[in-house]
């Protein structure tokens, strides 16, 4: 491709809208153009990158026996109502674009396709003889993000590969899940990316097990906790660990003490000369279910720990049926205004105890009149602890569960921390890294098939629900994440496997007929050898061309400059900036060798 004929415009300054390096560089280098908040045009260079990522994904999916298909982007609300997710996606979280057609039928623009594919399977899969099946698509998805940001990382429109598998039993599901795990590892390796596979929360997708694939980058939105022995890695939302050992309490007698002005853990510990590990603090939450009911929640947790709200949301979802609901649509720490709406009197915040009376809740038909009381294991195991006395400026010391307070249900709700000991080996401690979630695989189990009546006839003639898995990769996110992982002050450094072009031939002086002729010959030879090559034949200064070549990140640059007089050209490797002068006749072989060495 001749650069003089390409729609190619670069920017010298970082766009004001861009926050992270990869977003700045993709805009500056002419890969993408913002159309509206979270909506981008993929320009010719970017589309080539996306096609390459998609092709690698296709090859690895096809190698597992998965079959490519294409599902509708417009999805009827009835399917989502069958699964119970319409309220969550279209209203509670509000991430699904929804609309009414001219017959006033509700539709959604697909952020994901579990419901549609389950409906297809329900109609077409009849017998165990048809199983297993694994179908995938590469398609544009839509999410009405509250705050679109970071370019293609969190947009309202994005390209994704999503696959869905159907099975006769759980063992078959596990086998496909393992095959997808390996396929994803192959994909990210072939794309030239550094990544970690980590345990993850299943979120609104649901299911019994899930794993994320994180592309390592300092600007990643997700925190990963891992051990150096390579045996454990998890998203911080899911991570578990052994917390620091609690210091033995010096308070051996239960008594109420005046503790003026100690409504924080720090001030309380300073006043009592105690350690935060000796304190049980109460954290107040309120949850709203999809039936409109508000549930007050009282969490007891050790003073040096914090509540993981993802874990709490999952626990509330498991208990939703106890309150006549299906799911949680909001979870918040109530502020003063929120508390006024459901408390009978002002609460002694900062001094709450585990036995805060249910009578503190105002009588209201929309409010559940009893606290859900949960205790984290870090607090449940403490003895002779310090906690609030439910009275401003007062705490109790030397407290014990069952003796002084009923012990609530024990549930792991703490956020794992850097430096915590690993559960699999207490000599290993958790370290932290930032990552960009680029892939996610789930064992869905029977969640959707049971809800939507997708069954098959077993070998014994009985009707059973289909076992399901789903497997997603953000194709457009992978492309930008590659930039976030590999760039320098001059621009993008594309992995060779997904670079839009593998080589660029630069003519420093377009009026020099010798340079032009040599460049044309090298360009033709590289192209004939199957090397994807750009020819920078623009009427621009050499410095502009060199800067643009670095900015757009083409792996290998060939310059037909002064060395032509000796029958040689300069070749520059973008990643290392290593420059060498070689014979014109050696260019094709040299570039071929570099490409072969770089592509896994």
Curated annotation (Swiss-Prot):
GO biological process terms, semicolon-separated: prolyl-tRNA aminoacylation
EC numbers, comma separated: 6.1.1.15
Record-linked Pfam families: HGTP_anticodon, tRNA-synt_2b, tRNA_edit
Cellular component terms (Gene Ontology): cytosol
Keyword vocabulary terms for this entry: Aminoacyl-tRNA synthetase, ATP-binding, Cytoplasm, Ligase, Nucleotide-binding, Protein biosynthesis
Compartment(s) where it occurs, according to its Swiss-Prot or TrEMBL record: Cytoplasm
GO molecular function terms listed in the Swiss-Prot or TrEMBL record: aminoacyl-tRNA deacylase activity; ATP binding; proline-tRNA ligase activity
Catalytic activity: tRNA(Pro) + L-proline + ATP = L-prolyl-tRNA(Pro) + AMP + diphosphate
Cysteines paired by S-S bonds: none
Top-level taxon: Bacteria
Main location: cytoplasm
NCBIfam families, alphabetized: PRK09194.1, proS_fam_II
Function, as annotated: Catalyzes the attachment of proline to tRNA(Pro) in a two-step reaction: proline is first activated by ATP to form Pro-AMP and then transferred to the acceptor end of tRNA(Pro). As ProRS can inadvertently accommodate and process non-cognate amino acids such as alanine and cysteine, to avoid such errors it has two additional distinct editing activities against alanine. One activity is designated as 'pretransfer' editing and involves the tRNA(Pro)-independent hydrolysis of activated Ala-AMP.
Quaternary organization: Homodimer.
UniProt family annotation: Belongs to the class-II aminoacyl-tRNA synthetase family. ProS type 1 subfamily.
Domain topic, free-text comment: Consists of three domains: the N-terminal catalytic domain, the editing domain and the C-terminal anticodon-binding domain.
Entry protein name: Proline--tRNA ligase
Organism of origin: Synechococcus sp. (strain ATCC 27144 / PCC 6301 / SAUG 1402/1)
Taxon lineage: Bacteria, Bacillati, Cyanobacteriota, Cyanophyceae, Synechococcales
